């Protein structure tokens, strides 16, 4: 492939989104639309990407700087916005001036890299190549006008099209590959003599024909690849179509999804970590589960309904029961050991590390804590900044008090400890191996191995106790 530069159109206001967030920063699968398009440029190994900004540039340009990730990206402003041709005019001075220029739309997120490579190849370096698609309802799109010989003669925008032209179902996707050496000359000849009073980039097609430059249309069948976003409804429809495509790809690998229409795989919106789900054999995922960031499910893992799992590695044979939240952060993420049972209604926060056959039950929260093989916290408990040994049984209603108002402190619970119900372990504290903490105790000092520790008020019982009577209402 010859030298390739990319222009990304990202100046539009997106009025129909009815949002103060610029359209190109609206999220699809957890990633801004423009982030998907920058990925396309990166996948093409573009020499340079020039992003044309305008509306919301103060928000869009910092995002571009964060998302560049090794790509040579330049931003140019289009002020005022006078059409697509005018936008490309602003970008030309930032190009290298040779090779091929491919024009992408910042709100068309799902074009495949191999499709774009095929478009560039169709242009052959010296031709103008258009990416087109046939739509059952082409309203709003520019129509591809062909001559009697089938050759492309031009593109007519929907608002300027005649009734006969509006009947054409082959449309221009907004993506083209242009010989860099010809682009500036064509742009200089653009006029705004049209219904919109704008400078249309599509007018260069007729100029190419007039100049004897071949125009080729690379037509694809998959309309999803060139679908743009102009409204919340379109964004939601594209999200569902994209998620269904991801679900089908997983099922083709052998993953068992209870309902592929109720599955989501997203980027981690907090950190930008790309959504990736790797599954071993015989993995089962129930309905309405959301995966974000990097998640790995080992062989035979079962995920119950309505779980949210981010940045986690779940080892073979583990079961995550319904309504569980696993909220890891890279690089380490949350670790769940082989054969572990988690949930329902459990929460594993960053730094949670569960060993083999650990049980974390309903309404148990674990943060920045490790639990060794066979440890159990089955009911209504909190473990924060704790190291829990093998075979520990941690009772219902018990918590580690890890924060003194300024600093966090660790609790160590050694192997074979039994912690009764409704206990408070005030860190820093160590419960020695084989020890027992009596129910209802507040432990503030470390205890030796094998000891029974009880720290609670003495019970007082008053027989024949009379409860206070309610006062009469005034």
UniProtKB/Swiss-Prot annotation:
One of its GO terms (biological process) is peptidoglycan biosynthetic process. The keyword Glycosyltransferase does not apply. Keywords: Acyltransferase, Cell shape, Cell wall biogenesis/degradation, Cytoplasm, Magnesium, Metal-binding, Multifunctional enzyme, Nucleotidyltransferase, Peptidoglycan synthesis, Repeat, Transferase. Residues 233-253 are annotated as: Linker. Its EC number is 2.7.7.23, 2.3.1.157. InterPro entries: Bifunctional_GlmU, GlmU-like, GlmU_C_LbH, Hexapep, MobA-like_NTP_Trfase, Nucleotide-diphossugar_trans, Trimer_LpxA-like_sf. Mg(2+) binds at residues 107, 230. PANTHER family: BIFUNCTIONAL PROTEIN GLMU (PTHR43584:SF3), NUCLEOTIDYL TRANSFERASE (PTHR43584). In the N-terminal section; belongs to the N-acetylglucosamine-1-phosphate uridyltransferase family. In the C-terminal section; belongs to the transferase hexapeptide repeat family. This is Bifunctional protein GlmU.
